[in-house]
Amino acid sequence: MCTELSKRYEYRRAFSEVRLLEAMRYVRLEDGVNYNFITAGDVDSTSYLKVVLNQHDLDYLLISTWVMSAEDAFQIFEWYNTGCIRKIDMYFGDIYPNQYKMEWKMIREFYEQHPEAGRVAVFSNHAKIFAGYCEVDSFWFSCQLSCNANTNPRTEQACLQVNRGPCEFYIEYFDGINSFKFDRYG
């Protein structure tokens, strides 16, 4: 059953990423600009991260989501392993460890094998946010989304901000979070 869901998910994700990437193909992400999106539910939050990574490797990435699919976690870990992202702090909703056991195990194992990678935390979280930076490019961004890091059939919205202020605002807030379980610091 997991394989069937994965194939279906990959199709929807490929379709959504193609549309999003085509819309942003010739758009250089510029400091001080907010990019607003609305979709018919075939885009997940990781699709927006791909837009950013097509232009910049990241020294740091903050991910806040209620839930994350195994496919998205695997993709993010692949970006870490290839050096596209050098540090990742992940913050999940309190339902995640018990309702997404396979995915939670995968994430815990990643941080156990890579303690230098960053932090993972679980708390009463429903915020869907990416924030990060590349110091050498002087690039700072945040992305506020209605969608989680898994595709769903709903209308969703996102705002990608290229601006240091909101990025630092989110990093400062999430750095102060106390985790319910498995708080791993790098």
Predicted segments, located by residue:
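PLD/PLD-like phosphodiesterase catalytic module centered on the HKD motif
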Residues: M1-G186
